[in-house]
Amino acid sequence: MRPSGARRTLALAALAALALTATAAAAPPDALAEPNGGRGTSEFRGVNWADPRDNFASDEVVPSGLSTDDDYATTYDVATGILSEFRTELGANTVRLPINPWTVGTDWWESYTGAIDAATDLGMKVILSYWEADDAKDGRVDDMAAFHQMWTTVAQEYGRNRFVYAEPMNEPFGYSLEEWVDLTSQFLADHRREIPRSRVVISGTGYNDDVTGVGAAPELRGTLLSLHFYGFWADHTTEAEWLANLLPRISPYAHRTIVDEAGAPMTIGLNYGNHEGNTSTAYLGALTRVARENAMGIVYWPGLRNGDSYSLTELVGPGDLAVTSESGLAQLRWGWGLLDTEPVNDDPPAPPGAPVQGVASGRCLDVPGWSTTPGTALDLWDCNGGGNQSWDVRADGTVTVYADMCLTASGAAGSAAVIADCDSSAAQRWTLAGDGTITTATTGLCLTAAGTGNGSAVRIEPCAGTDHQRWLVG
């Protein structure tokens, strides 16, 4: 059912509340005890393993590196290789995996369980979380009957597996606190025989961005809580500002809370050892400090997702992962409690660079989606100070972004301006003139904005003296 079907009448809500009260009263004392004995959640040192499309899907969710063409045995073997890399390269002991009704109880489920089983056989904790479909994204369960059947199947298969945790829904922003407590209370009642409360992870309200409401709900006592926290939610550039942003979202429930989504750009050359002066590095410094000082677990987003600039690893071969940011990993490992000394330094937090702003539009030369894929075509976007809008004009005529990718003319007049690995070719050399034009060194064609709005393409065209071909650097 769609959102209207998920709402309960007041009468049904009252009956459900009475039933839950009776269930709680009849439960043994340890059923409502603090998870982990109130010692915190730092035992969760994890990563998300995500579908390249993101986990919002109207079909099977397939984490990067897996394939719906593979059977159980092949999926198990492929997953074992990737999960083993999470353990050895990162130090992770937890993986968060997506599920939905197109995945659970289907032909793909018969194979996908190979990934879950591979993780538990390695002694890793697994958090299974429901994502809504990409054609809904209203923060509510898409179909309550399908949702219930999905979790019933999961509970029957993994409810008694001590390594597997159930997170009823990812980012339930479509529900009020009262509605969300009602839904998750019913979830606990429905699956109380298979899944103990101590292995149920209740998402915070909104975009999982605040756990104080669910933490205070007596109906949810004994459960774990999940928080999401991202650096693109604000523009703070100091660790102190991020601490002030984060702490009110948690207090006083840190001992029950896992930050099961948190991430920052890992493929653009940032130095996470310096926490001042850059939004992303200050954010990660604050997050890891709060986690370490409050014995909170972090499940990084994502450990692996093809094409995601936040991905902490990339696939470089079958079962072989490469770390994308050593400084980012070191800061995360410190937050996990795996390092004795925080890996800080005084080097600049970001590569050198400045915005390149179109005179006609007032918007900035932008790498869409923070992509690091060679051949990505550039466009215009509102200036935001991000690393994907920070360009370094070098003495050799190259213009770099992320420290090691170059502005490149992809072809003749009318072709796109793209990013590519720097290779010293003529297509990557530019001349910045006093009139604001940026021209290719060999052909004399001008860097040109096709329009003035967000998303306008940037191409190389014959110079015509228009403001669409004039740029302000810095």
Question: What do these predicted regions represent?
Answer:
Residues 1-33:
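Secretory targeting and sorting signals
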Residues 9, 27-94:
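N-terminal carbohydrate-binding accessory modules
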Residues 29-38, 337-356, 454, 474:
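Low-complexity, Pro/Thr/Ser/Gly/Ala-rich linker/spacer regions in secreted
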Residues 60-76, 144-152, 156, 160-165, ...:
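Extracellular glycoside hydrolase catalytic/binding regions
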Residues 79-134, 144-147, 191-194, 283-294:
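Aromatic-lined substrate-binding rim segments of carbohydrate-active enzymes
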Residues 103-105, 134-137, 175, 266-269:
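Short, solvent-exposed loop/turn segments at secondary-structure junctions
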Residues 348-474:
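Lectin-like carbohydrate-binding module/patch detector with strong preference for beta-trefoil
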